């Protein structure tokens, strides 16, 4: 059967595109997902259903692609990505945070004039039901969207949240009541898409609205070998995909092919299909359909590591209780980039992996330091021409000295907060970052290189931009330059990573490009 739209990847954006495009009953949509699909909340495995109220680990789950990457100094880090309907929104930390106004206005200034903050504001509101502002949403919040957003009221904050906030306020950071309002900075409650601890993914919020439709077909456990092209005309046109289901190959045709496989899957699939840097494709014997140098380049993420404190025996630690309640956004001293630093205060910290993993024996609390708008960029390359093999990810993390300077200063700022009376009241010691690691810039850099990981916000690997930008892969409507019938709509098209967790922004990309398609762009 031939479909109007074949969407590859049922993740944060793909599930939204499928839901919005299938609102027209005259259009047939096929949504393909590499991982499994679950019909409802009650069917979800524990590690997918619950954000942190889980005793099982998402890290080693079949619902995680379990990628590896080189971070810095040859170190290997884990890169979890969702392999299930809902994509990474179904396995992430449920932080429902918008970028700041300038993030999106910068996209517009880079030649994507329909992506400014004011253009996107209706979509931020459209995707959400913000329980905090439900009765009075105003101009900056939604009260009728598919994704439920909550915050922990101050009177429910755990000791670590309270102590960290007190210390940050006394250090001069302002209080931020609403981190999703435009141009906010400071310390305050963290917005989360986890009502009652349930990870409210796009599979729940969006596919829950659309999976009954007869014009939407959802097929799970399907891998894609490559996109097919008709090259008989002047401009190659995407006509379908070769899909593998239970070991059997199928050719699926569509009037338009939309790749929403994420910032790793989408550029990998493009290159396997002959769309990417020509010399790199030829290394693996792949016929080049279109030489697009920007595919896999410009890789961005947020370097992140934890400063952990062992708490006193009197402080109760619940490994399946609230893990995240407050955050701090601030501008590094001497930085020209506003809000270039972010801190997530975490409860039930341990030696174990932190994000999404509650199968731990907690020892205390921690502050996760993230660097926004890193100047260092990474790249994604093929590891082989086999669609079953993972790509090679080199994050090139903190390679720029200004990145390292800002990060060093951020670690020292967090350490300084431990001297506040509220922090001293609950912490016993700092077990993993020793005083000797702080004695010099060189010692601290060495510690950072051994410990830094990622906030799991990989993006920008097939960025959108005007055709005059040699590294732009798509135009601002998501259409791949120099090809017909092929569109991208996920974190890969971001021109620059936002100063926030990216899940909200990726959902907005799904909504925005769905509207572009409906409008005939």
Where are these regions (language model features)?
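N-terminal redox-cofactor-binding region of secreted/periplasmic oxidoreductases
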Residues: 1-521
């Amino acid at each position: 059967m031939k479909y109007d739209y074949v969407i590859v990847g049922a993740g944060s954006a793909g599930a939204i595109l499928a839901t919005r495009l299938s609102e027209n009953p005259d259009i047939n949509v096929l949504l393909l997902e590499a991982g499994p699909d679950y019909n409802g909340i009650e069917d979800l495995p524990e590690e997918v259903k619950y954000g942190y109220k889980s005793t099982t680990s998402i890290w080693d789950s079949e619902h995680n692609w379990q990628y590896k990457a080189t971070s810095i100094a040859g170190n290997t880090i884990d890169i979890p990505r969702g392999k299930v309907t809902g994509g990474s929104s179904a396995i992430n930390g449920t932080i429902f945070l918008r970028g700041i106004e300038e993030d999106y206005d910068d996209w517009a200034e880079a030649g994507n004039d329909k992506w400014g903050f004011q253009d996107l504001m209706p979509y931020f509101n459209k995707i959400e039901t913000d329980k905090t502002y439900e009765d009075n949403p105003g101009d900056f919040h939604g009260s009728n969207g598919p994704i439920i957003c909550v915050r922990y009221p101050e009177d429910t904050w755990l000791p670590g949240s309270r102590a960290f906030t007190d210390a940050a306020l006394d250090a001069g950071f302002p209080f931020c009541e609403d981190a999703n309002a435009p141009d906010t900075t400071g310390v305050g409650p963290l917005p989360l898409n986890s009502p009652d601890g349930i990870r409210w993914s796009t599979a729940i919020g969006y596919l829950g609205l659309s999976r009954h439709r007869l014009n939407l077909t959802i097929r799970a456990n399907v891998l894609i070998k490559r996109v097919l092209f008709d090259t008989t005309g002047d401009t190659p046109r995407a006509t379908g995909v070769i899909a593998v289901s239970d070991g059997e190959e199928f050719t699926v045709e569509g009037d338009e092919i939309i790749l929403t496989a994420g910032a790793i899957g989408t550029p990998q699939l493009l290159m396997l299909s002959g769309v990417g840097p020509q010399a790199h494709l030829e290394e693996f014997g792949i016929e080049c359909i279109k030489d697009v140098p920007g595919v896999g380049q410009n890789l961005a993420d947020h370097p992140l590591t934890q400063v952990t404190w062992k708490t006193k025996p009197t402080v109760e630690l619940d490994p399946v209780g609230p893990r995240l309640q407050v955050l701090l956004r601030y501008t590094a001293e001497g930085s020209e980039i506003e809000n270039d630093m972010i801190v997530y205060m975490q409860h039930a910290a341990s030696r174990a992996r932190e994000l999404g993993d509650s199968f731990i024996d907690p020892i205390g609390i921690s502050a996760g330091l993230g660097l926004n708008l890193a100047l260092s960029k990474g790249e994604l390359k093929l590891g082989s021409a086999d669609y079953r093999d993972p790509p090679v990810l080199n994050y090139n993390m903190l390679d720029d000295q200004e990145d390292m300077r800002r990060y060093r200063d951020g670690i020292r700022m967090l350490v300084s907060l431990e001297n506040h009376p509220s922090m001293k009241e609950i912490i016993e010691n700092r077990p993993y970052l020793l005083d000797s690691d702080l004695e010099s810039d060189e010692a601290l850099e060495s510690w950072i290189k051994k410990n830094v990981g990622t906030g799991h916000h990989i993006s920008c690997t097939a960025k959108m931009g005007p055709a005059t930008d040699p590294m732009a892969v798509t135009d601002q409507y998501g259409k791949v330059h120099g090809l017909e019938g092929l569109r991208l709509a996920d974190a890969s098209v971001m021109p620059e990573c936002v100063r926030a967790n990216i899940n909200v922004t990726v959902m907005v990309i799904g909504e925005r490009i769905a509207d572009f398609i409906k409008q005939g762009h």
